[in-house]
Design a protein with these regions (language model features):
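Major-groove recognition helix of helix-turn-helix-like DNA-binding domains
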Residues: 75-98
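Short, surface-exposed loop/turn segments at secondary-structure junctions
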Residues: 74-79, 327-331
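Active-site-proximal, Lys/Arg-enriched surface segment
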Residues: 90-164
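Conformational gate/switch positions in structured elements
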Residues: 82-86, 132, 207, 313
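DNA-recognition alpha helix
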Residues: 57-78
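Short, conserved beta-strand segments within well-ordered enzyme catalytic domains
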Residues: 47, 63, 83, 88-90, ...
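Single, function-defining residue in the core of a domain
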Residues: 1-59, 123-124, 137-140, 152-392
Length: 392
């Protein structure tokens, strides 16, 4: 059953994760080496189904589903143990080869971006928004974590830095060490790891990155970027660029468009040219934009930055609808596995949402319902019945 006959169904999307892919990755990464139960493919299917749950999924609820007739009927592999305890699941998540899930995520991203992605603004370039989000947990539960601020509330935080290329998450980094609280370290690292290496990829991030070394490193690696710069940042003007044909972009008026050198500290100048666009809004508030792109118009630069907000919407989606703020595993290995599985499920739901024209909540709910219909029909057929004779 499909909720939209002219739309896309869950069965179509599940074809993006063929059994052959998971079996090949298991052999490549040796994720099942010396494993007698809880094979990689079992854990993959268990987490994918568990994350669709409306409630906060935990190790005990995963244990219940693993031991259910439905899971055994659908996903049991030869040699799989008949049952599993929550502590066995916890231990397996702590020691599994993360690269199995990382490579699965990368392969599924490639499929999704080739088949379903659409450029946000123009066919001339892709937009990759890069930002970080923090998730906290009580300190005695997390093996590692970051302390933020001076507040001693007994909690630590995990930092996730994610790149969102047009519609899909194209890279991710997990940080648990205190020195990575700075965006000057985390965002460039995530950018350099992006799966989509095309030259027409423009990265956009906020003012959290201010390091001149970070700007230079991105430029030297041919990474086009657009960011905000603190107003009145000291700089040396090298060249005034041609005035914009349309000096008003949305609520901003372009005042200056220049090639500049930026100051570092004191009187030290970083002799690396960047483009600085100065604007003001109707209230006179200043907004400065920095980029290494000279081929795009000032209007395009500003419009690219305005799409940075899309990643905030994505963070809200995975936190509210996919329980991303809830830790199933509290060690770094398990946290990374859950992250990759969350991103895989998010990509499937985003396609389902866009093509069927649903909202986020409706897309997630109907995706889960449609998957249940598929499972029910399959079980009826395997037991010799005809699902079409029933009222659903």
């Amino acid at each position: 059953m499909k909720f939209k006959e002219d739309g896309i169904g869950v069965s179509d999307l599940l074809k993006l994760i063929p059994d052959e892919l998971l079996l090949d990755l298991a052999a490549e990464t040796k994720v099942d080496y010396q494993v007698k139960k809880l094979y990689g493919q079992n854990v993959f299917n268990l987490l994918l189904y568990g994350l669709l749950s409306n409630e906060r999924v935990g190790l005990r609820s995963l244990e219940d589903f693993y031991n259910s007739r439905k899971f055994k009927f659908l996903f049991k592999l030869p040699g799989t143990a008949k049952s599993a305890k929550y502590n066995s699941l916890s231990a397996r998540l702590a020691t599994m080869n993360v690269s199995y899930f990382e490579k699965a995520y990368q392969a599924i991203y490639e499929q999704c971006s080739q088949l379903y992605d659409e450029p946000t603004l123009s066919l001339k370039y892709k937009i990759t928004r890069v930002d970080s989000t923090m998730v906290c947990q009580t300190a005695n539960k997390l093996e590692q974590g970051i302390n933020v601020g001076r507040k001693k509330d007994g909690k630590k935080q995990i930092k996730y830095t994610i790149s969102l290329t047009d519609m899909f998450p194209s890279s991710v980094e997990v940080f648990t060490q205190q020195n990575y609280i700075s965006e000057n370290l985390t965002i460039p690292k995530a950018i350099l790891k992006v799966i989509d290496k095309r030259k027409d990829n423009v990265f956009v991030f906020d003012r959290g990155v201010s390091s001149r070394e970070a700007f230079c490193e991105l430029d030297k690696n041919d990474c086009s970027f657009v960011t905000r710069l603190h107003v009145d940042t000291r700089h040396v003007v090298l060249q005034d660029l041609k005035p914009a044909e349309k000096p008003i972009v949305r609520n901003l008026t372009i005042i200056k468009d220049q090639m500049v050198y930026l100051y570092k500290t004191g009187a030290k100048i970083v002799e690396h040219p960047f483009r600085l666009i100065q604007t003001t809004n109707e209230k006179g508030t200043k907004y400065w934009f920095l980029t290494n792109q000279v081929d795009l118009s000032s209007e395009e630069i500003i419009m690219i930055y305005k799409h940075r907000w899309d990643i905030e919407v994505f963070f809200r989606f995975i936190k509210q609808e996919l329980n991303f703020s809830h830790f199933i595993s509290v060690n770094e290995n398990g946290i990374k596995i859950l992250l990759y599985m969350t991103l895989i499920l998010a990509m499937l739901i985003l396609i389902y949402k866009k093509i069927n024209e649903f909202g986020y909540k409706t897309a997630k709910r109907r995706f889960a319902m449609e998957l249940e219909y598929i499972i029910d029909d399959y079980m009826i057929e395997q037991c010799g019945g005809d699902p079409n004779t029933h009222f659903w």
